[in-house]
Amino acid sequence: MAEMKTDAATLAQEAGNFERISGDLKTQIDQVESTAGSLQGQWRGAAGTAAQAAVVRFQEAANKQKQELDEISTNIRQAGVQYSRADEEQQQALSSQMGF
């Protein structure tokens, strides 16, 4: 397995990328819901029922994906905080041992 190197700033940047993607997805969800809402009065019969069901499936899947992206972002941010804390503790321990 390849070695992974990172730092707190990189983790924060990547968390921001996931937040941006989540925000973009939310924009798409809102656009689909708006379009579906404006067309809903025109949906009739089996085709209308199928269209409504498709919108519901889309909403469920997209909302689940957004939730996953938000959780990933949170986890990355927490990892960055933990990384910084551990780095600081190691720096203090080393400084203490060396008498700095």
Curated annotation (Swiss-Prot):
Single biological process term from Gene Ontology: protein secretion by the type VII secretion system
Polar residues composition-biased segments: 91-100
Consequence of gene disruption: Bacteria no longer translocate from the phagolysosome to the cytosol of host (human) cells probably due to polar effects on the downstream esxA gene; bacteria replicate in phagolysosome, decreased apoptosis of infected host (human) dendritic cells. Loss of ability to lyse host (human) lung epithelial cells, possibly due to polar effects on the downstream esxA gene; in BALB/c-infected mice bacteria are not as invasive and cause decreased lung disease. No growth in the human macrophage-like cell line THP-1, no cytotoxicity. Inactivation leads to absence of EsxA and EsxB from cell lysates.
Major location (coarse): secreted
MF annotations from Gene Ontology: host cell surface binding
Inducing stimuli: Constitutively expressed, part of the esxB-esxA operon.
Compartments it resides in: Secreted; Secreted, Cell wall; Host cell surface; Host endoplasmic reticulum
Signal peptide: none
Coiled coil stretches, renumbered: 7-42, 49-86
Domain remark in the UniProt entry: May be secreted as a 4 coiled-coil complex with EsxA. The C-terminal domain is required for interaction with both EsxA and EccCb1; the last 7 amino acids are necessary and sufficient for EccCb1 binding and secretion.
Protein task: A secreted protein. Acts as a strong host (human) T-cell antigen. Involved in translocation of bacteria from the host (human) phagolysosome to the host cytoplasm. Might serve as a chaperone to prevent uncontrolled membrane lysis by its partner EsxA; native protein binds poorly to artificial liposomes in the absence or presence of EsxA. EsxA and EsxA-EsxB are cytotoxic to pneumocytes. EsxB (and EsxA-EsxB but not EsxA alone) activates human neutrophils; EsxB transiently induces host (human) intracellular Ca(2+) mobility in a dose-dependent manner, monocytes and lymphocytes do not respond.
Family: Belongs to the WXG100 family. CFP-10 subfamily.
Protein name listed in UniProt: ESAT-6-like protein EsxB
Source species: Mycobacterium tuberculosis (strain ATCC 25618 / H37Rv)
